[in-house]
Amino acid sequence: LKYLRNMIKISIIGGGGNVGYHLTAILLNAENIELIEVYNRTLDKIQYLKNDTSITTNLNQLKEADIYIICVADDAIVEVSKKLNFNNKLVVHTSGSVAMEELKCKANKGVFYLLQSFSKDKKIDFSNIPICIEATSKTDLELLKVLAKTISKNCYHINSEQRRNLHVSAVFVNNFVNHLYFIGNQICEDNNVPFEILHPIIKETASKIETLSPFDAQ
């Protein structure tokens, strides 16, 4: 692959969201990666990048890149992808629940799904994030693998159906569990007990899953 010898040029579409924010941060400092441009509907959320890379609000005049990474909300992926008129370029989205075929552009298609919960105010260690990739061609899949392994040790080839079900599993172990924390916190507040008293048992329960099956840890 020529990308093993040359810089991979990346354009991020939707740099103002949580995923786009963190992906921009890691790619700006990644080896053999050139983040040539970040797009967002409004400049205010990406203005801070003006000294590091090109920023734009115009989808019709994006710079030429090897990979265009769409980091917008799931329900905006179709509309955004329709506006990308590229040939022989790779366009990928980062959604866990949207099929690769939902990319409605002429370009080559793929998925670059980061299986992690992102918040702008919490720094993320990318080295252990599972990155699930999919592409319409072996060449593009190899390119995504090179990109993934540049920022993480964990790269998986996962198809759209597997990814959709994986996303459901992630909702159970992340969003549902976090809601249980919320309920626990409410009970503590109602009884004037500090929620911090539960931190050790929460951490112990979470750490068990690395050495025990969920059934055995129950």
Protein language model annotation of sequence segments:
Residues 52, 108, 123-167, 171-210:
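Internal alpha-helical scaffold of NAD(P)-dependent oxidoreductase catalytic cores
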Residues 12-14, 70, 133:
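Hydrophobic Val/Ile/Leu positions in short beta-strands of Rossmann-like dinucleotide-binding domains
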Residues 31-33, 63, 126:
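Structured loop/turn residues at beta-strand edges in well-structured enzyme cores
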Residues 5-57:
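NAD(P)+-binding Rossmann beta1-loop-alpha1 motif at the extreme N-terminus of oxidoreductases
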Residues 23, 80, 143-144:
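Hydrophobic side chains in well-ordered alpha-helices
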Residues 39, 43-124:
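Rossmann-like NAD(P)(H) cofactor-binding subdomain of soluble oxidoreductases
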Residues 213-218:
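C-terminal active-site/capping subdomain that shapes the small-molecule cofactor and substrate pocket
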